[in-house]
UniProtKB/Swiss-Prot annotation:
It is found in: Cytoplasm. This is Protein-glutamate methylesterase/protein-glutamine glutaminase 1. The gene is cheB1. PROSITE patterns: CHEB, RESPONSE_REGULATORY. NCBIfam families: PRK00742.1 (NF001965). The keyword Phosphoprotein applies. Phosphorylated by CheA. Phosphorylation of the N-terminal regulatory domain activates the methylesterase activity. Keywords: Chemotaxis, Cytoplasm, Hydrolase, Phosphoprotein.
């Protein structure tokens, strides 16, 4: 039985979340709390497997409570977030502090979305409960070094704000010669923001190809996510726009609620941003991105699947590999949820399985050979 503590100042939200969770026979809400202080007391008392945590609360807010949880009794935490720019920024900060993921707070609307939210909530709680200490499994490991390297140092752009992420980019090693890839496509879901930041912040400003990322996120979150990454990375990061050219040294985040695809028109690489197909399970979809990269560039495409629930990306990687592309998967031990990477590993499609600390180096290696 998975034990959960629900922390929220709204009586409606406490009841709604508890009701949704306990519809799953494998989940028990052992306590609820009205603010961060009460939440810490209940966590100490019940030692839950998972905590759901509101952000805006009296007496002690969610970010303060989260800091205490991660320092004193680290465990998987799901933030309960409003789908606003402010809510997105606070939630992204929470994930930097150690929260695993978030769930939307707009549960009062009577619609079919409630059924999906309920199922997603239950699945997230069950998946992350297996990771007792979020982020702590990201163990340091020596970077992969190809033979006869030439150093390429990642230095922050002048406009980039100083940060621990930017200052830890270090030196990536690359073999000589020209790149053999023209795009890096990344698919990621639960646990993704810290993983994506770890990878992108270690790439050099003169990274030779464009990077396109399909991160499962609502529309209100992808813009702030791109802006936050742009402030801590040497490469430029922005939200993808329909029709824009794919440029070297730049990463493009697919807008929430839309798909992003790579198009190749006589060697001119552009991005297509569209809500179609409407029936896709995820928007953005890693499948749509990976398939488009493979079809557009064949063996000059690189697909990377990072932490996430489910198997989004599997069908797209199949196409990418059929066209001669290269595929990397994040390792089980460094994933928050080993779902999406597991799908391509189990299918025999991953050329390499890589710890998250080594992923930037692995991407650099694959781009050059």
């Amino acid at each position: 039985m998975i034990k959960v503590v629900v922390v929220d100042d709204s009586a409606f939200m406490r009841k709604a979340l508890s009701s949704m969770l306990e519809k799953d026979p494998g989940i028990s809400v052992v306590a609820t709390a009205r603010n961060g202080e009460e939440g810490l007391e209940q966590i100490r008392k019940h030692d839950p497997d998972v905590v759901t945590l509101d952000i805006e609360m009296p007496r002690m807010d969610g970010l303060t409570a989260l800091r205490h949880i991660m320092m004193e009794m680290p465990r998987p935490v799901l933030m309960v977030s409003s789908l606003t720019v402010e809510g997105a920024e606070a939630t992204l900060k929470a994930m930097e502090l150690g929260a695993v993921d978030f769930i939307p707070k707009q549960l009062s609307t009577v619609s079919l979305d409630i059924v999906k939210i309920e199922k997603d909530l239950q699945e997230k709680v069950k998946a992350i409960s297996r990771r007792r200490v979020p982020g702590r499994s990201f163990r340091p490991a020596p970077a992969v070094r190809p033979a006869a390297p030439a150093a390429l140092r990642a230095t922050p752009r002048p406009s980039a704000a100083p940060s621990s992420a930017a200052s830890s980019t270090g030196t990536l090693q690359v073999a000589g010669g020209k790149p053999v890839r023209d795009v890096v496509a990344i698919g990621v879901s639960t646990g993704g923001p810290p993983a994506v930041q770890k990878v992108l912040s270690r790439l050099p400003q003169d990274f030779p190809v464009g990077i396109v990322i399909a991160q499962h996120m609502p529309a209100a979150f992808t813009g702030p996510f791109a802006k936050r990454l742009d402030g801590v990375c040497a490469i430029a990061v922005k939200e993808a726009e329909d029709g824009e050219m794919l440029m070297p040294g730049k990463a493009y985040i697919a807008p929430g609620g839309k798909h992003v695809r790579v198009r190749n028109t006589r060697g001119r690489l552009t991005l297509e941003v569209s809500a179609e197909p409407a029936e896709a399970l995820y928007k953005p979809s890693a499948n749509e991105l990976m398939e488009s990269a493979g079809l557009a560039l064949g063996r000059r495409s690189l697909g990377v699947i990072l932490t996430g629930m489910g198997s989004d990306g599997l069908e797209g990687i199949k196409v990418l590999k059929q066209k001669g592309g290269h595929a990397l998967a994040q390792s089980d031990s460094t994933c928050v949820v080993y779902g999406m990477p597991k799908a391509i590993v189990d299918a025999g499609l991953a050329d390499s399985v890589v710890d998250i600390d080594d992923m930037a180096q692995a991407i650099m290696n694959a781009v050059y050979k």
